[in-house]
Amino acid sequence: MRTLDKRIAPNVKLAASLVARAPTLTLAYDARCKSRLAATLDTGEDVAVLLPRGTVLRDGDVLVADDGALVRIAAAPETVLLVRAADPLTLMRAAYHLGNRHTPVEIGDGYLKLEADPVLADMLRRLGTQVDETHAPFQPEAGAYGGGHKHGHDATFAEDYALAQQVFGEHHGHAHSHDHDHDHDHDHQHGPGCTHGHHGHDHH
C-alpha cells in the first residue's frame, strides 16, 4: 500500500498537465481534517494518508506518495445547509452567531454553507434567513491566524471572545460578562478551520 505523506505547498505551481494526470482522492470535509487515515483513490487503489498533525486538506491540494507519484484531492459532495438572506445584514448576523459557536462555515457570494445540523438550521431560520439542505462540496474558511482553530483560551482566543461578548452585549442592550481567566489548557489543534472537536474529539 502506498503512503501519501507530503502535501505540495499551495504557492508551488505545478504543470497543469502533471496535475491533470494525477489520480484523485475524493474526501468529505471530516476526512480532510484527519492527518492519518486509510483511504481509497477514485481509481480503486487503497492508500494510507500520513500527514503532519493539524493538516486540513482542501479541494485541489496535491499530495506526494512515497514513490514520488502525485495524487490530487477533491472535495466530496456531502449534506450541507445552504443559507441565504434577503439582505446582507441578516446574512452577516447569521455569520456572527455561527462564529460565536465556532461552527465551520464556507462563505460565498451571497450565501453561507455549513454542515447539516437541525439545531443550527432552526436558529438560522429564527434569524430570518432561508435555509435549504443540499448536497455539495464543503470548503469552510481556514483559520484567520493560519495556525488552525485551537480549543483553548489562549490570548488571541480570549481577546476575540471578549470583543464578541462586548459587541453582543451592546447589540442586546446589556452587558454579558463572561470571565475567561480560568485556565483551560486545551491547546490541541485540528488545523485551519477544522472544529470537529466540539462534537466529540476525533484525534488522529
Swiss-Prot record:
Native organism: Burkholderia orbicola (strain AU 1054)
Alphabetically ordered keywords of this record: Chaperone, Cytoplasm, Nickel, Nickel insertion
Swiss-Prot/TrEMBL GO biological process terms: protein folding; protein-containing complex assembly; urea metabolic process
Coiled-coil positions: none
Protein name stated in the entry: Urease accessory protein UreE
Keyword Chaperone: yes
Region of interest called Disordered, as start-end residue ranges on this chain: 172-204
Record Gene3D superfamilies: Urease metallochaperone UreE, N-terminal domain, UreE, C-terminal domain
Family label: Belongs to the UreE family.
Role: Involved in urease metallocenter assembly. Binds nickel. Probably functions as a nickel donor during metallocenter assembly.
Protein's cellular compartments: Cytoplasm
Composition skew (Basic and acidic residues), residue ranges: 172-190
GO cellular component, one term: cytoplasm
Molecular function terms from GO: nickel cation binding; unfolded protein binding
Lineage: Bacteria, Pseudomonadati, Pseudomonadota, Betaproteobacteria, Burkholderiales
